[in-house]
Amino acid sequence: MKWKDWVHVTKLDPDKQLGPGDIDAIAASGTDALMLSGTLNVTKENLLALQKMIAQYDLPLVMEPAGPEAVLMEGIEYVFVPSVLNTTDVQWIVGKHRSWVQQQDGKIPWDMVVPEAYIVLNPASSVGRVTKAVCDLKPAEVAAYTEVADRYFHFPIVYIEYSGTYGAPAVVKAAAEAIDHAILYYGGGINSAEKAAEMGKYADTIVVGNAVYDQGASVLKATVDAVQ
């Protein structure tokens, strides 16, 4: 299955702890892919430790780097690289990307790289604070960012990120109506089948992360079943 066909992705944070039984249950949940992603305290060491825990399972593995200093590429199917469109700091749009390219010095396997246009909408989240995102956006403004990402910059993914809180379905609906070519991702606060189904009406792909750590793999499976 290609990444464009995924409907459910599980986001795993290298700064959080999972037991072997948790990994078994996540792998058996029916999720389409596993994403290694975090905002704080992400290092190559804890990324490698998490990768080792999940390497035995036959699931696509995505690296979503928080910055150029910790990016895995070996044993990874795709590297999803975010650009935060609604930030006041150009580092999060293109600056860190330039640093990564310079550091790699021609070694980036570009056929693995999938650019993401992030629209971050939770000001209390780590990603919102770190990236200095302007989060108080109306649905029409989110739709406009989505159209810019899709039609002007040609990002293959537009990612509506509420990170830790459940977002407004009207906002995701507005983004869905504005999009033409890109795949629409939604992440944030999905911890039940009902929420998964609601956001799954508008987003092509839902991402579940915190619920895995807070409520366990049974909730994860319920979110998978709601969209598949």
Swiss-Prot record:
Q: What UniProt keywords apply to this chain's record, in alphabetical order?
A: Cytoplasm, Lipid biosynthesis, Lipid metabolism, Magnesium, Metal-binding, Phospholipid biosynthesis, Phospholipid metabolism, Transferase
Q: What does the function comment of this entry state?
A: Prenyltransferase that catalyzes the transfer of the geranylgeranyl moiety of geranylgeranyl diphosphate (GGPP) to the C3 hydroxyl of sn-glycerol-1-phosphate (G1P). This reaction is the first ether-bond-formation step in the biosynthesis of archaeal membrane lipids.
Known NCBIfam families for this protein?
A: GGGP-family (TIGR01768), GGGPS_Afulg (TIGR04146), PRK04169.1-3 (NF003199)
Which reactions are catalysed by this chain?
sn-glycerol 1-phosphate + (2E,6E,10E)-geranylgeranyl diphosphate = sn-3-O-(geranylgeranyl)glycerol 1-phosphate + diphosphate
Keyword Calcium set for record: no
What's the protein name? Geranylgeranylglyceryl phosphate synthase
Instruction: Tell me the pathway.
Output: Membrane lipid metabolism; glycerophospholipid metabolism
Which of the seven top EC classes does this enzyme belong to?
transferase
Residues engaged in binding Mg(2+): D13, T39
Predominant location: cytoplasm
Q: EC number(s) in its UniProt entry?
A: 2.5.1.41
Q: Where is the chain membrane-spanning?
A: none
The record's subcellular locations are: Cytoplasm
Q: What PANTHER family does its record include?
A: HEPTAPRENYLGLYCERYL PHOSPHATE SYNTHASE, PTHR40029
Q: Which family does it belong to?
A: Belongs to the GGGP/HepGP synthase family. Group I subfamily.
Instruction: Name its GO BP terms in alphabetical order.
Output: glycerophospholipid biosynthetic process
Q: Name the positions where sn-glycerol 1-phosphate binds.
A: K11, Y159, I160, E161, Y162, S163, G164, G189, G209, N210
Question: One matching Pfam family, short form?
Answer: PcrB
Q: Name one GO molecular function term.
A: phosphoglycerol geranylgeranyltransferase activity
Cofactor(s) required, per the database record: Mg(2+)
